[in-house]
Amino acid sequence: MQGRLSAWLAKHQLAHRPLGFDYQGIEILQIRPQDWPSIAVALYVYGFNYLRSQCAYDVTPGGGLASVYHLTKVQDDADQPEEVCIKIFVSREDPRIPSVFWIWKSSDFQERESYDMFGIIYESHPRLKRILMPESWIGWPLRKDYIVPNFYELQDAY
């Protein structure tokens, strides 16, 4: 099912795949990683001036990874702002997605967290480094195929 935004992207010949709507009626679009920079700029020009959230998830054990962007069109006179959900799927072997930090600054920590937990590399991100785990940590803790290191942390009981 194609929504209003999908029709607008198709009219401007921007490659995407409509995935329908979520339970709140928010349109979901799939974008290829190589198309993401141009579509992100187009969405910003269209009025999606706020990146509400960005997250990632492991689709299946040993399968692909997904990066999800929730964009909102914030306007002074809008009772119900327009929203869209963008999903970008990448392979586990080459998990690279262009960063949108230069468009939405709020993606800074969110893309870093997705990198830290899933190993998705956000190309051209200015500070892509671990944000939750120590820099020396090996692996990506939220991947379904992650093997927990064999160690125990001792904590003081106060």
From Swiss-Prot:
Molecular functions (GO terms): NADH dehydrogenase (ubiquinone) activity; quinone binding
Superkingdom of source: Eukaryota
Keywords associated with the record: Chloroplast, Membrane, NAD, NADP, Plastid, Plastoquinone, Quinone, Thylakoid, Translocase, Transport
Catalytic activity: a plastoquinone + NADH + (n+1) H(+)(in) = a plastoquinol + NAD(+) + n H(+)(out); a plastoquinone + NADPH + (n+1) H(+)(in) = a plastoquinol + NADP(+) + n H(+)(out)
Cited PROSITE patterns: COMPLEX1_30K
Membrane topology field: Peripheral membrane protein
Subcellular location field: Plastid, Chloroplast thylakoid membrane
Database matches in SUPFAM superfamilies: Nqo5-like
EC numbers on record: 7.1.1.-
Keyword Nuclease: no
Example GO biological process: photosynthesis, light reaction
GO cellular component entries: chloroplast thylakoid membrane
Gene3D superfamilies: NADH:ubiquinone oxidoreductase, 30kDa subunit
Chief location: plastid
Function field: NDH shuttles electrons from NAD(P)H:plastoquinone, via FMN and iron-sulfur (Fe-S) centers, to quinones in the photosynthetic chain and possibly in a chloroplast respiratory chain. The immediate electron acceptor for the enzyme in this species is believed to be plastoquinone. Couples the redox reaction to proton translocation, and thus conserves the redox energy in a proton gradient.
SUBUNIT field: NDH is composed of at least 16 different subunits, 5 of which are encoded in the nucleus.
UniProt record similarity statement: Belongs to the complex I 30 kDa subunit family.
Protein name: NAD(P)H-quinone oxidoreductase subunit J, chloroplastic
Lineage: Eukaryota, Viridiplantae, Streptophyta, Embryophyta, Tracheophyta
